[in-house]
């Protein structure tokens, strides 16, 4: 039998002591209720006011500290707007730093998109009117300030932006916001003893050991029996999540980033890279409770161990516990959900050009070059399709502004038509081929950017300039 070191003995003793004093149900029973962000539903030209400001909030659950957010709250409200309408935006910056904001996934021209070229100094405002001309999608808004987007997003400048269309509104889907249609914003953080966020600038990676969902660690939500719709956003700076249900139950994947899939897909797990979004349905008809978790299910011993000695691991890997209430729903069968989407049609269309991008994750380079705002890296023609081949030295997220793509293949896996959805962000673990469609114009003054979705690497310059004309 191998001998334990003194350090291992002390660690084991500490865990054993903790286990002896913590009742088994305590970890679940002491959860806080999920906070659902306020909803701004845009109707009849209602303006969307987003005021960036400091506020107070107990991020660690016990210490009230200064954080950033919108309209007096930590994080931003969920914006819901219908395709075919106009977004009358009113951005106000009441923060001590200059801020640029982008709505990732929004299909709009470079001039209206926002992004790094639209910097608001302290006290400044910007009020664009943006036509919404894309199908149902889950977008998100965040800081896009050059060399400072990670810090500002981490402080709380993030929120969900949902686009609905006729199909999504008429589909047989849960649609009661905060009841059976739940937005979940995932962030990993690290705190000091006073509950303040810890952050190291100019680092290629950041992973915190505390997982917050809508600003709450390991929350629960009471839901009616039936199907529950979870709209997931990975707003972490660098961490990807391997999501699954802790009872090994299947989930229905219905949408990714910018569109529905042609048909709902049963999945046991789902990888969500930084900046990526997905929609899943969870069947709560025949179970009393289930937890969405990241990684594998942990025993009580493992939970206590990670709370005491987590390192880069999450102290608690619970995203959300769902607790079913009431009687069995009459609609407990798995819905046969199919959706109209033109994403698969791109496979049959002509490719104007093929480009290859090699991402050096360690040094923050794309094709051995660092971001230069004065240099155009890609010039594309509006209305064309290009094949981009993505390689990365280490697994990393990749994202693009103002355009959309489908994933053609990942490694040896060639995606089938029924697996395709429009996307703007993808996890590059091995060679990944995407077909990119350019429908929006950008200029030298207001270009689009592409590059890693790891905001730490983005701030180091792992980006490129995209002009579409």
UniProtKB/Swiss-Prot annotation:
Any Pfam family matching the protein: Cu-oxidase
Position of the signal peptide: 1-29
Principal location class: periplasm
Keyword Nucleotide-binding in record: no
Family to which the UniProt record says this protein belongs: Belongs to the FtsP family.
Gene from which this protein is expressed: ftsP
Keyword entries, A-Z: Cell cycle, Cell division, Periplasm, Signal
SUPFAM superfamilies found in the cross-reference section: Cupredoxins (SSF49503)
GO BP terms, alphabetized: FtsZ-dependent cytokinesis
Sequence ranges assigned to domain Plastocyanin-like in this UniProt record: 228-286
InterPro entries found in the cross-reference section: Cu-oxidase-like_N, Cu-oxidase_2nd, Cu-oxidase_C, Cu-oxidase_fam, Cupredoxin, FtsP, TAT_signal
Species the sequence originates in: Haemophilus influenzae (strain 86-028NP)
Name under which the protein is recorded: Cell division protein FtsP
């Amino acid at each position: 039998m191998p001998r334990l070191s003194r350090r291992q003995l002390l660690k084991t003793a500490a865990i054993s002591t903790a286990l002896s004093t913590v009742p088994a149900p305590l970890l679940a029973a002491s959860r806080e209720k999920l906070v659902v962000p306020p909803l701004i539903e845009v109707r009849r030209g209602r303006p969307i006011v987003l005021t960036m400001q400091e506020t107070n909030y107990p991020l660690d659950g016990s210490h009230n500290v200064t954080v950033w957010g919108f309209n007096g709250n930590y994080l931003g409200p969920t914006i819901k707007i219908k395709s075919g309408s106009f977004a009358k935006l009113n951005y106000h910056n009441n923060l001590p730093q200059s801020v640029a904001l982008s709505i990732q996934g929004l299909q709009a021209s470079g001039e209206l998109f926002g992004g790094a070229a639209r910097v608001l100094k302290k006290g400044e405002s910007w009020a664009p009117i943006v036509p919404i001309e894309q199908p149902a999608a889950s977008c998100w808004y965040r800081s896009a300030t050059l060399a400072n987007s990670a810090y500002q997003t981490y402080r709380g400048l993030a929120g969900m932006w949902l686009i609905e269309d006729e199909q999504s509104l008429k589909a047989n889907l849960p649609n009661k916001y905060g009841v059976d249609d739940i937005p979940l914003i995932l962030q990993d953080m690290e705190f000091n003893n006073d509950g303040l966020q810890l952050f190291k600038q100019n680092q290629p990676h950041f992973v915190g050991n505390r997982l917050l969902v809508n600003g709450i660690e390991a929350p629960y939500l009471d839901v009616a029996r039936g199907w529950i719709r979870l709209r997931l956003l990975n707003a972490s700076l660098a961490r990807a999540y391997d999501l699954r249900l802790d009872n090994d139950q299947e989930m229905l994947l219905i949408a990714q980033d910018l569109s529905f899939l042609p048909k709902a897909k049963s999945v046991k797990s789902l990888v969500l890279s930084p900046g990526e979004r997905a929609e899943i349905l969870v069947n709560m008809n025949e179970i009393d409770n289930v937890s969405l978790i990241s990684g594998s299910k942990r025993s009580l011993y493992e939970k206590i161990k990670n709370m005491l000695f987590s390192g880069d691991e999450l102290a608690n890997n619970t995203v959300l516990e769902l607790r079913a209430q009431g009687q069995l729903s009459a609609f407990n069968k798995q819905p046969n959900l199919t959706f109209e989407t033109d994403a698969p049609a791109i496979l049959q269309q002509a490719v104007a050009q093929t480009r290859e991008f090699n991402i050096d994750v360690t040094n923050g380079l794309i094709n051995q070059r660092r971001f230069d705002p004065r240099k155009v890296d890609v010039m594309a023609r509006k209305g064309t399709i290009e094949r981009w081949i993505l390689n990365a030295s280490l697994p990393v997220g990749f994202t693009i502004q103002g355009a959309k793509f489908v994933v053609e293949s990942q490694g040896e896996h060639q995606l089938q038509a029924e697996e395709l959805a429009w996307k703007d962000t993808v996890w590059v673990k091995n060679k990944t081929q995407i077909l990119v469609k350019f429908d929006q114009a950008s200029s030298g003054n207001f270009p689009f950017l592409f590059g890693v979705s790891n905001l730490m690497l983005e701030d180091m310059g792992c980006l490129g300039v995209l002009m579409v004309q």
